[in-house]
Amino acid sequence: MFCLNTFKSRWPREFQNLKKKKKKTCVKLSIPIRSVTGDAASLTVVVTMYKRDDYVRNKPGGVFSRWQGFARSMLLPKPFSETAELRRTVADYSLISRGLAPKILREAKGNREDLRVGKDFVGSRYRVQESIQGLGVAVNIHDADDISHGQTESIRTRLRSYGRPVPLLKKLGDNASQTITQKKTGGRSKDKKHGFEEERDVSRVEAEENNTNSVHASVLRLSRSRPQPVLERHDDIVDGSDSASVCGVLQEDGTTCLTAPVTGRKRCTEHKGQRITCAPPVKNPPCEEETEEICGVILPEMVRCRSKPVSGRKRCEDHKGMRVNAFFFLLNPTERDKILKEDKSKPKTRTSSTNQEEPGESLICEATTKNGLPCTRSAPNGSKRCWQHKDETVDQKSSENVQTSTTVCGVKLHNGSVCEKTPVKGRKRCQEHKGMRITS
């Protein structure tokens, strides 16, 4: 028992109150009283002291005391004529709600006696159908042409309704009810069904107006910064639905030109005088040799070099300073003679297509010039030399002279050998390898 009392003092205050609920305390006070005659008497007074939890708690709602009478009277099942409290609080409500009344009340019918038509109460979960006319001071009743009806929950629909024309609003005024839909915390199924029917009616009327093309109002498109007015005609151009507002010419990539035509014409300035299905003629691509920029040096395999030349030059980095047919004459004379003998030993019965495809394999003059270089002219059919070296004999010792020379060019050839030609006077390389370096 001792341990229980010690732990009881440590418990929180809420648990102590749950364990033992204290009753109210009565205090008796005896006050001595002396009468006029001088006799002594005593007056006993019993004072009842309640605990804090016994008092009636009031929430801090004293600020809203003016509104209590108005709200209570609106929720009571009594007509307006029998509610004196409502008539008394109308003046206070009008002074307070000058700016709030136009948002709550709209198109008041003036029926004061029957306030709750259709059993629609005033509250956070119901809607107001009819209200008192002139309940707030300076309540501006908007004109029927300027009021947005129907879908009040949708911000996009509310913004679009500002541009509706008069005939559309008149149709909406006949069909839609003059109601304001409040935010429902626990709405009923009937209210939801009624709201959906109103939305369907409004959307149906808008679709009919747009189909007849009688409405050319501007549409407000929402953006992150601010709404911007965009014409419906501009939307039609983007979508391509209106064929008269676009050029419509079929382009090369298969798409349709969506540019607006020139005033008074059917086409834009770019497609002036063209038909819709008329595509511009496609030019035949030129030959590969004309379009491609390649090095072009004939390699020992009789194939052109396809590498791109260095900017500002005709050859690539590997064939710098070389002519197109340089490799054919840079070979050793013995190997050159072998190639010529092989060409002679091949049968001459070739098709015309083969001769057209391989024009570079025609015979070359076998003579050697005075500076030791082979002649680059082509020999006519049936002869071994060109017209200049036709009467000269073949210099058999030209190769030996090149090999026995003390100074040679030294440039490494494509087949792995070294150029053994004598360089030009005052230079380190021969005429064919002018400006080239020796690659290790």
From Swiss-Prot:
Alphabetized UniProt keyword annotations: DNA-binding, Nucleus, Repeat, Transcription, Transcription regulation
Mark out the compositionally biased spans (Basic and acidic residues). 194-207
Annotated stretches, region: Disordered = 172-216, 339-363
Location(s) in or outside the cell? Nucleus
Question: Where is each GIY-YIG domain found?
Answer: 131-167
Q: Give residue spans, biased composition: Polar residues.
A: 175-184
Which GO MF terms does the UniProt record name? Answer: DNA binding
Q: Offer a single GO CC term for the protein.
A: nucleus
A single GO BP term for this record reads:
regulation of DNA-templated transcription
Q: Which InterPro entries match?
A: Effector_transcript
Q: What is its main location?
A: nucleus
> What superkingdom does the record give?
Eukaryota
Report each Cx9Cx9RCx2HK repeat as a residue range: 247-272, 295-320, 365-390, 409-434
Return the domain comment text from this UniProt entry: Contains a bacterial GIY-YIG-like domain.
> What's in the misc comment field?
Plants over-expressing ET display dwarfism due to short internodes, late flowering, reduced germination rate, increased anthocyanin content and reduced xylem lignification.
The protein's job, in short, is: Transcription regulator that negatively modulates gibberellin-mediated developmental processes. May act as transcriptional repressor of giberellin controlled genes. Binds DNA without sequence preference.
Q: What is this protein called?
A: Protein EFFECTOR OF TRANSCRIPTION
Native species of this protein? Brassica napus
Q: Which gene encodes it?
A: ET
